[in-house]
Swiss-Prot record:
This is Small ribosomal subunit protein uS14. The keyword GTP-binding does not apply. One of its GO terms (cellular component) is small ribosomal subunit. Binds 1 zinc ion per subunit. Belongs to the universal ribosomal protein uS14 family. Zinc-binding uS14 subfamily. The gene is rpsZ. It comes from Streptococcus pyogenes serotype M49 (strain NZ131). Binds 16S rRNA, required for the assembly of 30S particles and may also be responsible for determining the conformation of the 16S rRNA at the A site. Zn(2+) binds at residues 24, 27, 40, 43. GO terms for molecular function: rRNA binding; structural constituent of ribosome; zinc ion binding.
Length: 61
């Protein structure tokens, strides 16, 4: 879980475009965040297994 101060800081607009970085919308994790879903790999996996992300299915080949 991210610190509340870091989550609040990330919500403010960056002064320069290179300062902006992605954080997970659910838990605030800064690493391994998917841009398409705005979720980290851990939260993405949890929600995908529960079936809460439309169009995402477990791969089988």
């Amino acid at each position: 879980m991210a610190k509340k101060s870091m989550i609040a800081k990330n919500k403010r607009p960056a002064k320069h475009s290179t300062q902006a970085y992605t954080r997970c919308e659910k838990c605030g994790r800064p690493h391994s965040v998917s841009r398409k879903f705005k979720l980290c790999r851990v939260c993405f996996r949890e929600l995908a297994y529960k079936g809460q992300i439309p169009g995402v299915v477990k791969a089988s080949w």
